[in-house]
Amino acid sequence: MSKRIVTIVGARPQFIKAAAISREIKKYTDIEEIIIHTGQHFDKNMSDVFFDELEIPKPKYFLDIHSSSHSQMTGKMLAGIEDVLLQEKPDIVLVYGDTNSTLAGALASSKMHIPIAHVEAGLRSFNKKMPEEINRVLTDHVSNLLFCPTKQAVRNLKAEGITSGVYHVGDIMCDATVFANNYISKNLDRFVNQFDLKSGDFALMTIHRQESTNDEETFNELMSYAKKFSEKNNLKIFFPVHPRIKKLIQKYKEKNNFYFLDPLSYFETQYLLSKASFVLTDSGGLQKEAYFHRVPCITLRSETEWIETLESGWNRLWTVDSYNSRKPIIDYGLGYGAKSIVEILSNRL
């Protein structure tokens, strides 16, 4: 009889991470994976093509829960996920990262005494005002298997008294980047024709976090910083526009150094990232992906959970004027994190 894993995701970055593990799960004939999409972030780019390109199945369940307060969203997700878990009766629940979907999946499973596996466990920004930080901490403290991307994440858990079920497996975003690079190589003409650009003459910029966009003054400070940065370094700014900031960018549309783009697919983002001179972002994931492509990053936040990128000199906070001396390698693994995770899951099921 096959063992059953329920995977809970709610945002595009979580699908990218889950895809790496789903591709490994498919190699096991005795494991069945069922995917729940909470709907936390609706993304029009997540069509059938999105799942085909990532080589993963479409979600069996779509809860369509989004666009409400953190508490309302998490509460609705708890109820919706519980209904699915009662029906599917999984042997283990797999959650990713630090979204409301992560926390809701972990809490629902914990209350039903279903084992929980948390991918990207142990990360800490130590900023309790970030909703993601609360989600990370609470999820870790109810999880049974904690898959850490870094040794620092393992140390963070130990400092909180969590030592059982902790595994240092490397960063599965490294797995995802290897997969993306192979995909881009096979479809290179498509990307070259789509983007008329010269390598190195632009910076890739993204802003999407609520703390960056809810306050117009903060957003304007970030845009002013980016403008000065581009002028100082003689770089264009390629800026895919998140739906949250469409109104905020109107007064910048006539600025010659900003090139506003429609939202990009995952593979389009990876292609532009590989050609950029710099990355400016408030995204945690893009900080790492910049490193995987060996592109210097400036994080548009006052802290980051990926402290290795700061210590290694590949990343710096926008409030700091200089990088640390650059080291060639960060211990994020070699792209086999998903394989290690599924082997551990298989042995525990």
What are these regions (language model features)?
Residues 28-34, 233-237:
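A generic structural motif
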